[in-house]
Structure formats: C-alpha cells, structure tokens
A protein has these predicted regions:
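Nucleotidyltransferase catalytic core that binds NTPs
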Residues: 1-131
C-alpha cells in the first residue's frame, strides 16, 4: 500500500480541502503535515490563522480520509518530516505545478489535484467579512 503525504495550513477547512484529501486517500493512508500557528502568521500575516492549531488538527483528524496529522514550524522541519516518512506519493494542489516543492525529492511521485476555483481560504474569509 502506498504511503501518501499532503501538507498545508488547512485554515478555514473548506470543500476544496476535503476533495483534495479524499483524492489523496484513493492512493493509500494519508499523513497530513500542517503548518504551526506561528508559521501561518509569518507566511500569511498577523490576522492569520483564523482557526488555531488545536482546532485545525481536530477537524483534520475527524475526516475519514486522514490517517495521521503532524505539525511543522519551518521548511527544514517540513523537509525532515517528509524524508523520515518516505512517502510513495505526495499530493499537491494544481497551483503548485511548475513550482519548487519542498521534499519532492523524497517522494516517488507527485500527484496534482485540480484546484476548485470557487473554494479557497482567502475567499471564505472575504465572504465571511463581507456579511
């Protein structure tokens, strides 16, 4: 059975995330590597994350498509976790096609899931803010 890895912040979990994780699970057990709160704040700004780490982990663990969740705080930690897990497959959103992907060299294969344009964390935050 393939070992599958997915990584991201998963802040404001939405249908696009769910579909990506369901797609990943079709290949084997899924380990989700999730950004720490500090890392999200550093990458996305002082108002993020919307959902704290405990909430994001709890939501992900509740999904039948997710087998395990681990936290990382830096690119180095992410790469180390990927190397140690030694996945057969890494699943990324199609927006990563043509980009450098941390830890890709430790995976046998990278699979891309077509992003569902109407679903994004940024869009969800904007929709909530405009109400």
């Amino acid at each position: 059975m393939n070992r599958v890895i997915v990584n991201g912040s998963f802040d404001v979990l939405h249908v696009g995330h769910i579909k990506l994780l369901e797609y990943a699970a079709t290949f084997g057990p899924v380990l989700v590597l999730i950004d720490s709160d500090r890392r999200i704040k550093e990458l996305k700004g002082p108002t993020r994350p919307i959902n704290r780490l405990y909430e994001r982990i709890t939501l992900l663990r509740a999904l039948k498509s997710v087998d395990e969740v681990e936290v990382f705080d830096s690119d180095i930690e992410l790469e180390t976790l990927i190397r140690e897990y030694s996945p057969d497959i890494m699943v990324k959103g199609s927006d990563y096609i043509g980009q450098s992907i941390i830890g890709a060299c430790y995976c046998n294969e990278i699979k891309f899931y077509d992003r569902i344009e109407q679903y994004s964390t940024t869009k969800a935050i904007q929709d909530i803010s405009s109400r």
